[in-house]
């Protein structure tokens, strides 16, 4: 009788090879009945001896028990966004900037790779010794949500790399998506069950990836194309085309509709071809990604703050459609701003039915010379947000009347005002239900107090039933009352009360941001909180020395004036008093004050005016932790090595940046050198 361990290993190999041939190569090599028999044999072996289970076993694709939630994880390599180009001129301008940063003549030819931009959801896959260890969403580019159990169900993602002697770690980036035919089948099933239909494949994919039950994910049959590869040190292929070939050989599905082009003209032909040919593809694509092929040239070009200079996404022109304007409504934002909304006869755009679009403000209405009954042209900006592009006045009915914005708030009936040169018309009634709902949503949002379990629907119930009239009222709710509301149970209510209680310990800058003061975003809130350790000191400065606020980096007189106006409005003063009564200090903790003081002391520190580059994997510090230490000491972190670089901080698998730094005579530091340099 065969050894169970050897037989299980043999079955894993046979089934994984067959799965790769079927899902990735589209060339089945095993009969379905044979596959099913071998699969059942492996499953039985693993059930009899759980010690035989391995992460790369095909039995692990079906998903385990539902998860309670997702954890946030840091990406080993950041996932930056791409700059966009919307036409040939934009693409040419990007190419000219690239030549300039590479110090090449304007007529130079650069090797470029053209790839289809798949309209799905980006994933980060981490492999350790050839086995899938972790999968995460893109998130904010630095951190994402771990969804490994869900990603294991995607058959075109190998659980084990199909290569001999894989590197110790491999990082892969790619796009999860739902093919058009699969999407149609999913919506047909949902329609039969009388469930809400998904708007488009991208939305369906995003919702599927965040399902807590992997079995639901498996049933929706997601697909995946790999497009980015990160390997340690010298193992990294020399260019993008070679990286795609490596991914293909390792068992990943790589989009076959790609091309290695010798110059910009060839890339433009590639883009033109797929702008027309995309409609014949079995999946959605919303553009072409153009990348510089050569890795050394990529390193030389470097990055801006948010995107690589060596790549660009050429977006296809937005679809447009004519329709008839029926009416113009109005929405009230959390600051009281009135946003006019065009309502028109529904038209299909980019895979969805569209019947509403923002008109932004009164100036936009005047610019369009909009009349009720007009024939308007609508498009989706970036194929996401509907907008009115223009009016066709030659089709205007003789009895059409100009669109007028309301004079009273549609929510509370108060008179609307328009201050100075502002484009926005506003409701200034602090008791307006719409302003209250928006303020509550902002207060509990992730960047502010980050209260889990308090969504828009629940906020609407609380406001509409008169249970909450201010931010402070949230903290007077008890579990019994919450449990009586729609879609709330005892456990959900108890968890929400605990989450609200915990939010009182959020840092001072989050509390300040959560107040929703006009022009005070997250960055400005941090700057203000670091300079003024309490709401009282901030209010005093706003009254007696507003120039102190205006002089802060990134603030200025307009923001200072807005802050002063808010702080000295009686209704807001009452709100601050109420927040204190429910347990908010509205001031920085001792540790926050010490950290801010230290940061201020280090503003002229050892790295003031210095430019550093990070490369490789540091033994103890994450990339973001090292960056924070450098910036706290007054230094600047750049994405590329140049003659202006003062220090290169190099970890394991430093790669080409280390080579370039050494050739330029840049001082190279280890993590230990960096921490020693920062010691007082």
From Swiss-Prot:
Its EC number is 6.5.1.2. GO terms for cellular component: cytosol. GO terms for molecular function: DNA ligase (NAD+) activity; metal ion binding. GO terms for biological process: DNA repair; DNA replication. Residues 602-680 form the BRCT domain. Its cofactor is Mg(2+); Mn(2+). Keywords: DNA damage, DNA repair, DNA replication, Ligase, Magnesium, Manganese, Metal-binding, NAD, Zinc. Zn(2+) binds at residues 409, 412, 427, 432. It is an enzyme of class 6 (ligase). The keyword Manganese applies. It catalyses: NAD(+) + (deoxyribonucleotide)n-3'-hydroxyl + 5'-phospho-(deoxyribonucleotide)m = (deoxyribonucleotide)n+m + AMP + beta-nicotinamide D-nucleotide. SUPFAM superfamilies: BRCT domain, DNA ligase/mRNA capping enzyme, catalytic domain, Nucleic acid-binding proteins, RuvA domain 2-like. The keyword ATP-binding does not apply. The active site is at residue 117. NAD(+) binds at residues 32-36, 81-82, 115, 138, 175, 291, 315. Residues 47-66 are annotated as: Disordered. InterPro entries: BRCT_dom, BRCT_dom_sf, DisA/LigA_HHH, DNA_ligase, DNAligase_adenylation, DNAligase_N, NA-bd_OB-fold, NAD_DNA_ligase_OB. Belongs to the NAD-dependent DNA ligase family. LigA subfamily. HAMAP family: DNA_ligase_A (MF_01588). This is DNA ligase. The gene is ligA.
């Amino acid at each position: 009788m065969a050894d169970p361990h050897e037989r299980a290993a043999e079955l894993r190999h046979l089934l994984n090879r067959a799965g790769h041939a079927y899902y990735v190569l589209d060339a089945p090599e095993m009969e379905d009945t044979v596959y099913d028999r071998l699969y059942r044999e492996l499953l039985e072996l693993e059930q009899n001896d759980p010690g035989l289970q391995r992460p790369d076993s095909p039995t692990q694709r079906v998903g385990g028990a539902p998860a309670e939630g997702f954890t946030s994880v840091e990406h080993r390599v950041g996932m930056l966004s791409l700059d966009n180009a919307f036409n040939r001129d934009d693409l040419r301008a990007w190419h000219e900037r690239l030549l300039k940063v590479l110090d090449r003549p304007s007529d130079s030819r650069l090797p470029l790779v053209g790839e289809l931009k798949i309209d799905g959801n980006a994933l980060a896959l981490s492999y350790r010794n050839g086995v899938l260890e972790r999968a995460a969403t893109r998130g904010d580019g630095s951190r994402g949500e771990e969804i490994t159990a869900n990603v294991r169900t995607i058959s075109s993602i190998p659980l084990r790399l199909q290569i001999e002697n894989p590197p110790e770690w491999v990082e892969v980036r790619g796009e999860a998506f739902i093919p058009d035919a699969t999407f149609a089948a999913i919506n047909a099933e949902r329609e039969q069950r009388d469930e809400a239909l998904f708007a488009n494949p991208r939305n369906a994919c995003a919702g599927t990836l965040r399902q807590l039950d992997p079995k639901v994910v498996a049933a929706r049959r997601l697909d995946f194309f790999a497009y980015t590869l990160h390997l340690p040190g010298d193992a990294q292929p020399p260019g993008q085309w070679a990286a795609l070939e490596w991914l293909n050989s390792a068992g990943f599905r790589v989009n076959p509709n790609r091309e290695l082009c010798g110059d910009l003209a060839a890339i433009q032909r590639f883009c033109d071809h797929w702008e027309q040919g995309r409609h014949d593809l079995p999946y959605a694509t919303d553009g072409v990604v153009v990348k510089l092929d050569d890795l050394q040239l990529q390193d030389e070009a470097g990055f801006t703050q948010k995107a690589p200079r060596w790549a660009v996404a050429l977006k296809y022109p937005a679809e447009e459609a004519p329709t008839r304007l029926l009416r113009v409504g109005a929405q009230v934002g959390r600051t009281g701003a009135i946003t006019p909304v065009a309502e028109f006869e529904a038209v299909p755009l980019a895979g969805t039915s569209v019947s509403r679009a923002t008109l932004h403000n009164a100036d936009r209405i005047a610019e369009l010379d909009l009349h009720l009954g007009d024939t308007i042209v609508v498009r989706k900006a970036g194929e996401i947000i509907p907008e009115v592009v223009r009016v066709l006045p030659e089709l205007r009915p003789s009895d059409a009347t100009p669109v007028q914005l309301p004079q009273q708030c549609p929510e509370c009936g108060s008179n609307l005002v328009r201050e100075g040169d502002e484009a926005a018309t506003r409701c200034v009634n602090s008791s307006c239900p719409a302003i209250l709902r928006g303020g509550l949503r902002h207060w509990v949002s992730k960047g502010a107090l980050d209260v889990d379990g308090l969504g828009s629907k629940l906020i609407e119930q609380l406001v509409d039933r008169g249970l909450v009239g201010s931010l402070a009222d949230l903290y007077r709710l008890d579990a019994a009352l919450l449990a009586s509301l729609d879609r709330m149970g005892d456990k959900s209510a108890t968890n929400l009360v605990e989450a609200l209680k915990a939010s009182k310990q959020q840092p001072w800058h989050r509390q300040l941001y959560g107040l929703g003061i006009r022009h005070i975003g997250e960055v400005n809130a941090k700057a203000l909180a670091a300079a003024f350790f309490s709401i009282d000191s901030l209010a005093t400065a706003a009254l007696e020395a507003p120039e102190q606020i205006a002089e802060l980096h990134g603030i200025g007189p307009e923001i200072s004036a807005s802050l002063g106006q808010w702080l000295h409005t009686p209704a807001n003063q009452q709100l601050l008093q109420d927040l204190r009564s429910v347990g908010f200090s509205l001031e920085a903790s001792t540790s926050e004050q010490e950290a801010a003081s230290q940061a201020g002391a280090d503003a002229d520190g050892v790295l003031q005016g210095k430019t550093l580059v990070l490369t490789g994997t540091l033994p103890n510090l994450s990339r973001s932790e090292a960056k924070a230490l450098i910036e706290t000491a007054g230094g600047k972190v750049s994405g590329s090595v140049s003659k202006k670089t003062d220090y290169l901080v190099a970890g394991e698998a430093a790669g080409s940046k280390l080579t370039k730094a050494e050739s330029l005579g840049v001082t190279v530091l280890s993590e230990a050198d960096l921490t020693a340099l920062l010691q007082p």
